[in-house]
Structure formats: structure tokens, C-alpha cells
């Protein structure tokens, strides 16, 4: 996609899994040879067409749609936080409005859809999740990145993910959306959105997306190291407030407290 669109050649995509929105976006995420994050590479247009067969995707390994759910609801939270209290260009405002459909279907159909996907069934709920992951998130991204910047298309959850790619275990054993979904929990705690945090926490628990460092195999020491890098990631360069190490430390403490309350209930 990156090579062809840059060279003005037509590209058609045929996603066979629903792990992210890359089939419909006008951006490619570039990595260094060692697997660490390099940069987003933006294009003037997306692929010419994306051919989506939900029957094929419903029978694909479940972990891909599972991870895609985390990357998808992140779009809503990051777009709305990054654009807060700003007078937006029309195309950016359209992207923010569309991003609501990146969250709502997952909260409504996530648990049932994932259960059906585990059975290989292309149910209504599965289709809604697939379309949210691949199409809605991709379309939102096109509008949010029309000025070729990630200002409104990323945020703290992605900053957390990209900072954690410094540890080989993330790229070797975990998926992008899986870790981003965990990052959303911390981002919501940092932002003081307790009600939204609880919604996402319950969704993550229902489909077994991570709610702890242990589930993504990151040690306390590695997290402590990451809190020094995260505030300087490009994903939070455009944010309504500066991210600090203390904010991240406090958010992790609150997340652990929430998990602890559940363990004692």
C-alpha cells in the first residue's frame, strides 16, 4: 500500500482479518528493522476499494478481531480528547463525529460478537464489529489525518503502546490493538473519565482484553522506565494538557485498585 499509493498506482485491499483499519486508511505505520516504531506515513488517498467478506473474517483466528476491538474504541477516545475545546476544520470535525461509531457498536455488541466469532459465526453482532474496526475507524482516520498530521488521530493510548514496543515481548507475543486497548484504560483514568473507564474495563474483562501489566507481560520496572518515555512520544505532542510521569503513575495505581476491588468482591 505504501509503495503503490506513493507511486500513484491503484491499490485494492482484501482484509481476511479484522485486527485494524489499515485496509481503508490513508496511512501506513512504519517501523524500524528492530521492530520499534518509526513514524506514520500519510498518503493523499486510501486504497481504491476494500473487499470485505465477513464470512471469511468470522472464521479467521479470533485473536485478531479481539485485538482490533481495542484499537477501534481507542479512536473515539483519542479523537475526542485530542480535539477538546478546539475550533476544528470541518473535515476534522467530521472525523471526530464519525469516531463515535468506533466506540458505540463495540460497547453494544462486543461481548456477544466476540462469542459468536469464537464459534465462526458471521452474526449481525460480528458484522457490526468488523465494519467498525475496518471501515468506520478507517474513514474516521482519513478525515482526522487530512492535514497529514497525527494530531487528532492518536493520543495517550497509542503513546503507551509505541513506548512499550521498546521491549521485544510486545512485538513478539502481543498485538497492537491488544496493548492499545489496555492503554485506553490508563488514558481514561488520566483524563478523569471514570464512567467511560468503567465501560471499557467491563468490555475488556468480558472479552479478556488486558486490564493489567501482567497480561501484556510487562514488569513493574519496565513500566517505570516507560513512564519516562511516554510523555515525549509524538502521539501526545498535540493534547489538551501535558502528560507527566506522575499522571501515568497515578493512573496505574487506580487501575490496580480497580482490579483489586473486583478480586475481593
Residue ranges of model-derived segments:
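A glycine/threonine-rich phosphate-anchoring loop and its flanking beta-alpha core
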Residues: 5-99
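Active-site segments that bind and position negatively charged phosphate/pyrophosphate groups
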Residues: 89-202
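Alpha-helix C-terminal capping segments
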Residues: 2-10, 189-192
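Short alpha-helical scaffolding segments that buttress acidic/His motifs in well-ordered protein cores
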Residues: 73-77, 126-140, 184, 204, ...
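C-terminal charged capping/lid subdomain of soluble metabolic enzymes
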Residues: 193-265
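Short helix-capping/linker segments at secondary-structure and domain boundaries
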Residues: 61, 80-87, 143-145, 190-196, ...
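A short secondary-structure junction motif
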Residues: 76, 80-84, 136, 167, ...
Amino acid at each position: 500500500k505504501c509503495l503503490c499509493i506513493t507511486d500513484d498506482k491503484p491499490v485494492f485491499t482484501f482484509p481476511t482479518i479484522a485486527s485494524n483499519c489499515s485496509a481503508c486508511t490513508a496511512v501506513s505505520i512504519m517501523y524500524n528493522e528492530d521492530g520499534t516504531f518509526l513514524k506514520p506515513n500519510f498518503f493523499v488517498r486510501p486504497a481504491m476499494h476494500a473487499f470485505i467478506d465477513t464470512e471469511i473474517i468470522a472464521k479467521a483466528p479470533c485473536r485478531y478481531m479481539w485485538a482490533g476491538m481495542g484499537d477501534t474504541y481507542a479512536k473515539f477516545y483519542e479523537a475526542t480528547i485530542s480535539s477538546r475545546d478546539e475550533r476544528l476544520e470541518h473535515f476534522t470535525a467530521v472525523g471526530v463525529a464519525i469516531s463515535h461509531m468506533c466506540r458505540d457498536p463495540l460497547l453494544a455488541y462486543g461481548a456477544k460478537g466476540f462469542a459468536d466469532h469464537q464459534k465462526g459465526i458471521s452474526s449481525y453482532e460480528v458484522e457490526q464489529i468488523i465494519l467498525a474496526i475496518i471501515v468506520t475507524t478507517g474513514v474516521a482516520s482519513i478525515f482526522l489525518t487530512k492535514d497529514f498530521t497525527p494530531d487528532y488521530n492518536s493520543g495517550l493510548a497509542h503513546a503507551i503502546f509505541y513506548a512499550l514496543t521498546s521491549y521485544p515481548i510486545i512485538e513478539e507475543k502481543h498485538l497492537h490493538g491488544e496493548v492499545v486497548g489496555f492503554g485506553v484504560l490508563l488514558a481514561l483514568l488520566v483524563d478523569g473519565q471514570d464512567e467511560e473507564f468503567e465501560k471499557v474495563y467491563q468490555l475488556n474483562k468480558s472479552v479478556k482484553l488486558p486490564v493489567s501489566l501482567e497480561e501484556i507481560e510487562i514488569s513493574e520496572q519496565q513500566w517505570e522506565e516507560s513512564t519516562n518515555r511516554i510523555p515525549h512520544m509524538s502521539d501526545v505532542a498535540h493534547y489538551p494538557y501535558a502528560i507527566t510521569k506522575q499522571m501515568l503513575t497515578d493512573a496505574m495505581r487506580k487501575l490496580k485498585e480497580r482490579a483489586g476491588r473486583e478480586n475481593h468482591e
